[in-house]
């Protein structure tokens, strides 16, 4: 039989105090909805239907082409949300997972175990439950002496005895698809909230003598639903611990994993060393034996093997094997650094390609440049790429030596093996093998300093 999935993502999330739909708030680099969608993929659903509502167009954009969408125009409860999927799923034979889009910590393994449990026990409905020492606020799972599920009782309706139950409802379910939609026709809004509750179908199944079961999570953290910023921060913390643990198991060393922030899609090879306060975001990839020191921040970039990045920022760029960057360097988007390049302290590279073995040790700006191999930039070199309206390119060949405190005004080309004298302002192309000196001639005026106030004779 087929598996189907319904993801509930229509809520506004008032307690988040945000215009952004709740399910689009991010945990470890991707939205909560994407986390749930990826986990749902473990059951290989034939159809996945996402129920949208508040700012539906934003939610649909995130999963465009990956799921079908239905709209819940009025927020009339979880049962009502599932009813919205009827045109797509009613009458199909199979098992349907119903899950909230604000549960980013649920794993694909747990959802696979849930649906296998449901099938193996021939249940018409299976509730995903968890156990906690502090069940206050959760619906409790009431079982009979044979451990069969009798009902779900909410906190406000629970007796003193039922309040002692530690097994709680996580809000995730698997149903026989055909029976689900039959039962939904019989639920009503006769409750304090005036809403259709998906939990009411459990009572209907019990009344008709059908089998209802419960599968209990091994890890309570997976049950966390995010309703406010506090819970969002908790989810972030749990997810990052998982991510860091996975990398450590795979051979990555962390000085302080509690102070290291790695997004879920980051790839890290073995033998990488990561110091505290390192942030790796987006689609970043780190090669083997690379060292990332305290304070390094990398976004959507690829760093090769054996690199050393010291307290620097790298954005949307590629860094080859053996490169050293920093401290306090900034590699801005669309840059590429060849093998063994050295970018030192207080150097900024923007939109430039730099050939292997090139060095810019300190206090340099390289913007919109094509730089060859074995180039040396002296301290204080500036490539001037912007005239206030347009940006221009500088081309620097192989084996070029640029003296300290030089200004290279684009568009200009420095040929292979050329040399720029220190303190020069270069406005014209420099041929290969040439020396360019673009500064005023030094003039010494003997004894002139004796006329000035600073001179000891005038004190």
From Swiss-Prot:
Domain of life the protein comes from? Bacteria
Q: In which pathway does it act?
A: Nucleotide-sugar biosynthesis; UDP-N-acetyl-alpha-D-glucosamine biosynthesis; N-acetyl-alpha-D-glucosamine 1-phosphate from alpha-D-glucosamine 6-phosphate (route II): step 2/2; Nucleotide-sugar biosynthesis; UDP-N-acetyl-alpha-D-glucosamine biosynthesis; UDP-N-acetyl-alpha-D-glucosamine from N-acetyl-alpha-D-glucosamine 1-phosphate: step 1/1; Bacterial outer membrane biogenesis; LPS lipid A biosynthesis
Residues at which UDP-N-acetyl-alpha-D-glucosamine binds? 8-11, 22, 72, 77-78, 139, 154, 169, 227, 332, 350, 365, 376
Question: Which Enzyme Commission number(s) are listed?
Answer: 2.7.7.23, 2.3.1.157
Catalysed conversion reaction: alpha-D-glucosamine 1-phosphate + acetyl-CoA = N-acetyl-alpha-D-glucosamine 1-phosphate + CoA + H(+); N-acetyl-alpha-D-glucosamine 1-phosphate + UTP + H(+) = UDP-N-acetyl-alpha-D-glucosamine + diphosphate
Q: Region Linker: start and end of each range?
A: 230-250
Q: List, in alphabetical order, the Gene Ontology terms for molecular function in this entry.
A: glucosamine-1-phosphate N-acetyltransferase activity; magnesium ion binding; UDP-N-acetylglucosamine diphosphorylase activity
Q: What class of enzyme is it?
A: transferase
Q: Which InterPro entries match?
A: Bifunctional_GlmU (IPR005882), GlmU-like (IPR050065), GlmU_C_LbH (IPR038009), Hexapep (IPR001451), Hexapep_transf_CS (IPR018357), NTP_transferase_dom (IPR005835), Nucleotide-diphossugar_trans (IPR029044), Trimer_LpxA-like_sf (IPR011004)
GO BP terms: cell morphogenesis; cell wall organization; lipid A biosynthetic process; peptidoglycan biosynthetic process; regulation of cell shape; UDP-N-acetylglucosamine biosynthetic process
Kindly list the positions annotated as binding acetyl-CoA.
Answer: 379, 385-386, 404, 422, 439
What GO terms fall under cellular component here? cytoplasm; membrane
Catalytic residues of the enzyme = 362 (proton acceptor)
Q: Which cofactor does it need?
A: Mg(2+)
Compartmental location: Cytoplasm
Q: Supply the alphabetized keyword list.
A: Acyltransferase, Cell shape, Cell wall biogenesis/degradation, Cytoplasm, Magnesium, Metal-binding, Multifunctional enzyme, Nucleotidyltransferase, Peptidoglycan synthesis, Repeat, Transferase
Is Repeat among this UniProt entry's keywords?
Answer: yes
Where is region (N-acetyltransferase) located? 251-459
User: What does the record's cofactor remark say about binding?
Assistant: Binds 1 Mg(2+) ion per subunit.
Residues bound to Mg(2+): 102, 227
Q: How does it assemble?
A: Homotrimer.
| Function of the protein | Catalyzes the last two sequential reactions in the de novo biosynthetic pathway for UDP-N-acetylglucosamine (UDP-GlcNAc). The C-terminal domain catalyzes the transfer of acetyl group from acetyl coenzyme A to glucosamine-1-phosphate (GlcN-1-P) to produce N-acetylglucosamine-1-phosphate (GlcNAc-1-P), which is converted into UDP-GlcNAc by the transfer of uridine 5-monophosphate (from uridine 5-triphosphate), a reaction catalyzed by the N-terminal domain.
Extract the NCBIfam families matched here.
Answer: glmU (TIGR01173), PRK14354.1 (NF010934)
PANTHER family linked to this entry: BIFUNCTIONAL PROTEIN GLMU (PTHR43584:SF3), NUCLEOTIDYL TRANSFERASE (PTHR43584)
Assigned protein family: In the N-terminal section; belongs to the N-acetylglucosamine-1-phosphate uridyltransferase family.
- Spell out the protein name for this chain: Bifunctional protein GlmU
* Source organism of this protein record: Streptococcus pneumoniae (strain Hungary19A-6)
């Amino acid at each position: 039989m087929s598996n189907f999935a319904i993801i509930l993502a229509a809520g506004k999330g008032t307690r988040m105090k945000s215009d952004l739909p709740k399910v689009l708030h991010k945990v470890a680099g991707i939205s909560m909805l994407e986390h749930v969608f990826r986990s749902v993929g473990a059951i290989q659903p034939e159809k996945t239907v996402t129920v949208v509502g508040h700012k539906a167009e934003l939610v649909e954009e995130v999963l465009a082409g990956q799921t079908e969408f239905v709209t819940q125009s009025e927020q009339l409860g979880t049962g009502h949300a599932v009813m919205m999927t009827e045109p797509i799923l009613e009458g199909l034979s199979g098992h349907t997972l119903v899950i909230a889009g604000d549960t980013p910590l649920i794993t694909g393994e747990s959802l696979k175990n849930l649906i296998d449990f449901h099938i193996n026990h021939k249940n018409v409905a299976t509730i995903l439950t968890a156990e906690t020492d502090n069940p206050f606020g959760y619906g409790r799972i009431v079982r009979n002496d044979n451990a069969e599920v009798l009902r779900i009782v909410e906190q406000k309706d629970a007796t003193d005895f039922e309040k002692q139950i530690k097994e709680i409802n996580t809000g995730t379910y698997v149903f026989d698809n055909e029976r689900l939609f039959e039962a939904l026709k019989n639920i009503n809004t006769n409750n304090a909230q005036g809403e259709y509750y998906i939990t009411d179908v459990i009572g209907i199944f019990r009344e008709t003598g059908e089998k209802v079961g419960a599968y209990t999570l091994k890890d309570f953290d997976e049950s966390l639903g995010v309703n406010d910023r506090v819970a969002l921060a908790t989810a972030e913390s749990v997810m990052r611990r998982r991510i860091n643990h996975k990398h450590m198991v795979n051979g990555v060393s962390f000085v302080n994993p509690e102070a290291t922030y790695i997004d879920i899609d980051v790839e890290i090879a073995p033998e990488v060393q990561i110091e505290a306060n390192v942030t790796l975001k987006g689609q970043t990839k780190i090669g083997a034996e690379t060292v990332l020191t305290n304070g390094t921040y990398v976004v959507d970039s690829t760093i090769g093997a054996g690199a050393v990045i010291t307290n620097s920022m790298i954005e949307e760029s590629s860094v080859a094997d053996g490169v050293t960057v920093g401290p306090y360097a900034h590699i801005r988007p669309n840059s590429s650094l060849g093998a063994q390049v050295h970018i030192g302290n207080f150097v900024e590279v923007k939109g430039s390609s730099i050939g292997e073995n090139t060095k810019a040790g300190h206090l340099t700006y390289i913007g919109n440049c094509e730089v060859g191999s074995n180039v040396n930039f002296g301290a204080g070199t500036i490539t001037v790429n912007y005239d206030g309206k347009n940006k221009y390119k500088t081309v620097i060949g192989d084996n070029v030596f640029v003296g300290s405190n030089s200004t290279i005004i684009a568009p200009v080309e420095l040929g292979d093996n050329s040399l720029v004298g220190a303190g020069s302002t270069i406005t014209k192309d420099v041929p290969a093998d040439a020396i360019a000196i673009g500064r005023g001639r030094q003039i010494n005026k003997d004894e002139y300093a004796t006329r000035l106030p600073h001179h000891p004779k005038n004190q």
